[in-house]
Amino acid sequence: MANILAIDTSTDTCSVSIGKENEVFSFHENIPRQHTEKLFSIIADLLEESKLSYEELDAVAVGTGPGSYTGIRLSCAVAQGILFSQSIKGISLSSLELLSIEANKESPSSTFVAISQENLGNVYIAESSFSDGDIKSKFRLISSDLFKREGFPEDCHFVGEGCALFPEVINVLPGAIPKSKYLLEIAKKRLNKSELIEPEEILPVYLNDENSWKKIK
């Protein structure tokens, strides 16, 4: 069975999980502005609790944002460092996809639309569907003024902070925060199917200079 480390620090909440065989060891706490200081010690504590070492990891999964500039750069850099040092591969998911995964467990639907917080009049959107336990998504950045409910499937469910901007949509999971345990579930499936990526392919989606959503290339 696989040993996987999953990390999401895209919000004020630091969420880290380790999957070992059929066990899950998790840390999920709101620690604003403390991610850089505490992330490595949190990982070390979970490795100790799970009786694993870095050398025994088969993959590292990371939530790549959008979200906190510092948080997602940190999680991606840490994931890359571990992957390079252990000569293993990784899995990445948008942090918006993690919201849809949780929402699908609470209120199943064929399609989910996760909407980010607004930045300079724009929102980042992930439109996701599920098949064989995995998630497939289309991403787009649009002006809040151009958002139309009619542009999405009639039976879709909405989730994310950005839902509050649009009275015509109902947030099916208010207050949802990306959770690494859901990232772990997808990571296991992709590892089993050998759908992994190289360390250098783990790229954050972040607020560039706090002015615009930008994906590093």
Spell out what each predicted region is.
Residues 30-41, 69, 73, 77, ...:
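Residues at secondary-structure transition points
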